[in-house]
């Protein structure tokens, strides 16, 4: 029951503005009221993680966006991963899969372009699962669950892991700066 908005200079990683709801209320005596959701609130990021999964394959030098996969559904262990529209778009390229936000496409990248350890290390390189170094109290590191194959599959499209808004801002800054890591 909260929202966050933030503006950042992508080249310097400087936070220009940040706000959210509920806002600080000095009359409310609970610890949550004293936390900054930009750094404290960890959440399942959903499809925003697809950007980083694709970037991991691109950075490894193995990504071929013209290769095709069958969208719709895929089985991973005992779970069925579905595209958001439940039917997919037939056989499409990985580039189209990114455009259509295909859960199946990003899931099939594991084993095809990346293995689970490479994905986890790449997510860590982008700062997920650790503190960013920002000078604000109560920063959450989030969590990266990669124990089971279905957890890895879900992580590719932002389910089953927890991240913070500041981690996403820092990761996007790294992309904008050609991989250079800056502290917000």
Label for each model-derived stretch:
Residues 3-41, 55-184:
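Beta-lactam-recognizing serine transpeptidase/beta-lactamase-like catalytic domain environment
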Residues 40-49:
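Gly/Ser-rich catalytic serine loop of serine hydrolases
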């Amino acid at each position: 029951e909260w929202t966050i908005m933030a503006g950042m200079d992508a080249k310097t990683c400087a936070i220009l503005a940040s706000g959210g709801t509920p806002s600080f209320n000095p009359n409310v005596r609970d610890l949550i009221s004293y936390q900054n959701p930009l750094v404290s609130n960890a959440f399942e990021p959903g499809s925003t993680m697809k950007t980083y999964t694709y970037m991991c394959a691109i950075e490894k030098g193995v990504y071929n966006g013209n290769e095709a996969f069958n969208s719709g559904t895929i089985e991973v262990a005992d779970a069925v991963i579905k595209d958001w529209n439940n039917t997919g778009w037939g056989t499409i390229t990985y580039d189209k899969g990114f455009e259509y936000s295909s859960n199946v496409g990003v899931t099939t990248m594991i084993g095809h372009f990346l293995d689970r350890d490479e994905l986890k290390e790449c997510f860590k390189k982008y700062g997920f699962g650790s503190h960013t170094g920002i000078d604000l109290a109560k920063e959450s590191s989030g969590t990266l669950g990669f124990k089971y194959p279905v957890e890895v599959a879900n992580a590719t499209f932002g389910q089953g892991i927890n991240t913070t808004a500041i981690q996403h801002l820092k990761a996007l800054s790294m992309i904008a700066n050609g991989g250079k890591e800056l502290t917000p």
